[in-house]
């Protein structure tokens, strides 16, 4: 660690959207953002779970627009930067400009781990706006460390000043994480930061985040009570407690985070965010974590097991953006019964 302070990036108000089908009220956003700001996290990501303009038939309609959510958070935050997420092909540079005007100052431009080349326009425009611009390589378990490093190098070339290893499926272990960070560090400029976005489907969210920091990672994503897709993200309050015991600098108020997790976030969950039969299947099969709620809906509709659908999606190597295939897979399974 060398005494450097970790950059704590909260994702409760973006990844956490998946856990409640994108239904945060504006008051929920204000309360959670204020609590996070009071606890001194560095950034607070706000958007539909699938990023700017994710509200749709394919991904699920949000209770509010991205801009309403961003403005609500920006109104109450004094210390943290407001971040947002953009997936090229869902959000556009026009949406990014609107988010910036609403108060977002950090953007994470997210692509599948082998498709960094679709991010060039969005990364370049974010830099022109003066935003803290991050490349976000989703489903990082689906390619080799060496190939991931090549994709990271592309994003760096477009102008991203931080590149994330993103374990969208919660499918990686600590060795997988170490291998990927070592590969990235070998090719990126020394001044380019790296980040880790974990999911907890194998209960390794905190352990993987710690392994990332040990490999030189600068920024860590986490969420209150792990509020996120699948079994959730690395639980923020647990990560802070664990690294505090290691003597690492994080700048956050542990007890304030513990209170916010239990008092503000956990009561909102209509389905517990935890490792259980279905979310463990996500991590084991290496499936995009936000498929969980869609699979459970399809399983109920067609009289199937959600686990069977998830395992089949994993076999077919489905990735984020292919939510429409969940029903196709469910119908195939039903017809083959």
Swiss-Prot record:
One of its GO terms (molecular function) is 4-hydroxy-2-oxovalerate aldolase activity. It catalyses: (S)-4-hydroxy-2-oxopentanoate = acetaldehyde + pyruvate. Residues 6-258 form the Pyruvate carboxyltransferase domain. Substrate binds at residues 14-15, 168, 197, 288. InterPro entries: 2-IPM_HCS-like (IPR050073), 4OH_2_O-val_aldolase (IPR017629), Aldolase_TIM (IPR013785), DmpG_comm (IPR012425), DRE_TIM_HOA (IPR035685), PYR_CT (IPR000891). Its EC number is 4.1.3.39. Pfam families: DmpG_comm, HMGL-like. The keyword Transferase does not apply. The active site is at residue 18. Mn(2+) binds at residues 15, 197, 199. Interacts with MhpF. This is 4-hydroxy-2-oxovalerate aldolase. The gene is mhpE.
